[in-house]
Regions:
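Short glycine-rich, Thr/Ser-proximal phosphate-binding strand/loop in the N-terminal lobe
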Residues: 2-52, 84-86, 170, 174-189
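Short helix-terminating capping/connector loops at secondary-structure junctions
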Residues: 3-4, 61-66, 144-147
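Short glycine-aspartate micro-motif
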Residues: 9-13, 66-70, 151-155, 161
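Glycine-rich phosphate-binding loop and adjoining helix at the ATP-binding site
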Residues: 40-44, 68-69, 78-148, 187-188
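Phosphate/pyrophosphate-binding loops at sites that engage ATP/ADP/AMP, CoA/4′-phosphopantetheine
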Residues: 50-69, 112-113
Length: 199
């Protein structure tokens, strides 16, 4: 889908344990990824780590200029405005009071910043360029007229997330992410599902 897109986008996979930075062009990573500890318990250290990671990727690009920063973040947030947190975030407790991360990074690096939920982006990526088109291509090759356009994707890591695509559109829910956020664990009273299933 984006194989001829010459724009360079700096990426980040923001996990509760590690932050993994990269740069993509035409759907391919073009520099060696940078992995740094997330420092999720300390807001100042976490923000410094993000600036360091993005700066190292920009340095690795040399003369090539990125068009934007785009990345995934766990949990509910005001993603359209780049504000992370504002509630219970077990993987990033230092973001609990809400952090204007998108505007901070835009001001620091001078390029647009796009942030979305990690579970949502996983599901949307699989719907656009992953398993869903692969299944539909197999159906077409087999002579079937059936095509799928709905998908639910689950993510397991330090946390647990879900993304949902319905009629080829990302369903963001009413908190900018469709997931089992703070759902009580049925078999383990006192903890949420995320704490009971994550690795």
């Amino acid at each position: 889908m984006y194989t001829d897109d010459k724009r360079i986008v700096i990426t980040l996979d923001a996990g509760g344990t590690n932050l993994v930075f990269g740069a993509m062009q035409s759907g391919e990573f073009i520099v060696e990824p940078v992995t740094l500890p997330s420092q999720a318990q300390n807001l100042d250290l976490c923000m410094q780590t993000m600036v360091e990671g993005f700066s190292r990727i920009i340095a690795a690009l040399g003369e090539r200029k990125p068009a934007a920063i785009s990345f995934a973040f766990p949990g509910p947030a005001d993603y359209p405005h780049g504000i992370i947190g504002g509630g219970y975030l077990p993987n990033f407790p230092s973001f609990r009071d809400g952090v204007a991360l998108g505007p901070f990074l835009e001001e620091h690096f001078g390029i647009p910043v796009f942030i979305n939920n990690d579970g949502d982006l996983f599901a949307y990526g699989e719907a656009l360029c992953g398993v869903l088109p692969e299944i539909n291509a197999r159906l077409e090759a087999a002579g079937s007229s059936k095509r799928y356009k709905n998908l639910i994707g689950y993510t397991f890591g330090t946390g647990f997330g879900i993304g949902m695509v319905v009629d080829n559109r990302l369903n963001r829910g009413d908190n900018s992410c469709v997931e089992t956020f703070c759902l009580p664990h049925r078999n383990m009273p006192g903890i949420i599902v995320e704490e009971g299933v994550s690795v």
